[in-house]
């Protein structure tokens, strides 16, 4: 009976989400065609609401911005009823966040001229300018628009980093560095943890850039290895990058940050990392290392979509039933993220099916949480492609 009820609920939820997606303006494929204002008006005339959002709070204007729609089309959408420069979208971001993220200088200037708040922070505490910088945007013209609107060029953001440090990873030829140096920033800037420009540049895995920084006297820190492991939003670094940092720059392969994380904490849920994982296993990096929240690389790997890394970790696991500060085990991670293969691997290793978290929740609760209606899976893996 319970099973039938759950299936019925899942079916109803799927139908609901499907119904929500009938608005053609919410179809990502529509925006791949660079539609004109006239094309959008035609769809609106058919009854498609230009202010609607999908299940992940990406509204139509956000989709248009993230798919680099024509400026006139985006401007038209911003001015439609239900849309505004203060409208909150995914992660409580306003349109200025997305315009800056895409490096759309014309749109940034337009939104600022309409009164968009250059200091507005999303749910992660990120403002439009640092959101852009940390996602690879380094064009001076766009930052000029922010500075002219009153944004302090030397403002400190997350962990005491400035825009220059965030943008450095994408500044292959250090051209933006010259620009930011005229705004009170320099290659000698560090964040609150002493991370240098070298560490921030390591995120890109650009060895040529890293060598340029060394030539300029910028010292590396152990955290550079962890920055490299984090990579960028859509790209991961190569084995060559890690070998350069460990074997030439002489950063310890077992380096940890202040949160107690090693490279495995960042690599364990990324795809196509098998050779890199094997390299660091050979260097003695600990798969059982718990960070300050009690999370281990094994737990993170158990929650990944692929099981290749988990399989590499399992022979080195000391206690498969280790729990983090919330009382979650590797099996909890696997169940919550809906990975039957990972669950089977952990059970074969002796994982306890009766595990409960600190709130007394058993695996059944996490199984319910693992349910994702059809149509939401893609957005949950890479929402910016929505």
Region locations from a protein language model:
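Bacterial Sec-dependent N-terminal signal peptides
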Residues: 1-25
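Sec-dependent signal peptide cleavage junction
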Residues: 18-45
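Ankyrin-repeat boundary/"N-cap" motif
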Residues: 21-31, 52-65, 87-97, 121-133, ...
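Ankyrin repeat A-helix N-terminal signature
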Residues: 33-35, 63-70, 98-104, 131-139, ...
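Ankyrin repeat domain, specifically the short helix-to-loop turn at the C-terminus of the second helix
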Residues: 41-49, 75-84, 109-117, 144-153, ...
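Long, mid-chain structured domain cores
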Residues: 90-134, 138-150, 164
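Solenoidal tandem-repeat scaffolds enriched in leucines and small polar residues
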Residues: 136-257, 262-265, 270-273
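Eukaryotic tandem repeat interaction scaffolds
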Residues: 238-386
């Amino acid at each position: 009976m319970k099973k039938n009820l759950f299936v019925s609920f899942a079916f109803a939820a799927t139908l609901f989400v499907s119904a929500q997606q009938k608005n053609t303006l919410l179809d990502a494929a529509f925006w791949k065609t660079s539609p004109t204002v006239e094309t959008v008006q035609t769809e609106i005339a058919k009854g498609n609401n230009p202010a609607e959002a999908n299940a992940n709070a990406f509204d139509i204007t956000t989709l248009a911005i993230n798919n680099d729609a024509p400026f006139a089309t985006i401007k038209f959408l911003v001015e439609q009823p239900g849309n505004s420069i203060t409208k909150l979208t995914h992660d409580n971001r306003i349109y200025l966040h997305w315009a800056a993220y895409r490096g759309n200088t014309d749109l940034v200037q337009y939104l600022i001229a309409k009164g968009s708040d250059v200091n507005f922070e999303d749910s992660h505490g990120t403002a439009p300018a640092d959101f852009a910088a940390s996602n690879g945007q380094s064009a001076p013209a766009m930052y000029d628009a922010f500075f002219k609107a009153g944004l302090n060029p030397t403002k400190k953001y997350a962990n005491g980093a400035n825009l220059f440090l965030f943008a450095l990873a994408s500044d292959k030829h250090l051209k933006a560095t010259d620009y930011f140096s005229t705004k009170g920033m320099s290659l000698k800037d560090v964040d609150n943890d002493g991370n240098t420009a070298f560490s921030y540049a390591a995120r890109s895995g650009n060895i040529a850039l890293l060598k340029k920084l060394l030539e300029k006297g910028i010292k590396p820190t152990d955290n550079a290895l962890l920055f490299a492991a984090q990579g960028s939003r859509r790209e991961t670094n190569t084995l060559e990058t890690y070998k350069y940092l460990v074997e030439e720059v002489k950063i310890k392969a077992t380096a940890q940050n202040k949160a107690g994380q090693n490279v495995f904490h960042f690599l364990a849920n990324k795809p196509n990392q098998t050779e890199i994982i094997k390299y660091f296993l050979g260097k003695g990096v600990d798969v059982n290392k718990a960070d300050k929240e009690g999370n281990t690389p094994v737990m993170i790997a158990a929650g990944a979509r692929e099981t290749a890394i988990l399989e590499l970790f399992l022979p080195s696991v000391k206690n498969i039933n280790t729990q983090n500060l919330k009382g979650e085990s590797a099996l909890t991670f696997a169940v919550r993220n809906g990975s039957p293969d990972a669950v089977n691997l952990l059970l074969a290793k002796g994982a306890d099916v009766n595990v409960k978290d600190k709130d007394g929740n058993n695996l059944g609760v996490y199984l319910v949480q693992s349910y994702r209606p059809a149509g939401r899976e893609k957005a949950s893996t890479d929402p910016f492609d929505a």
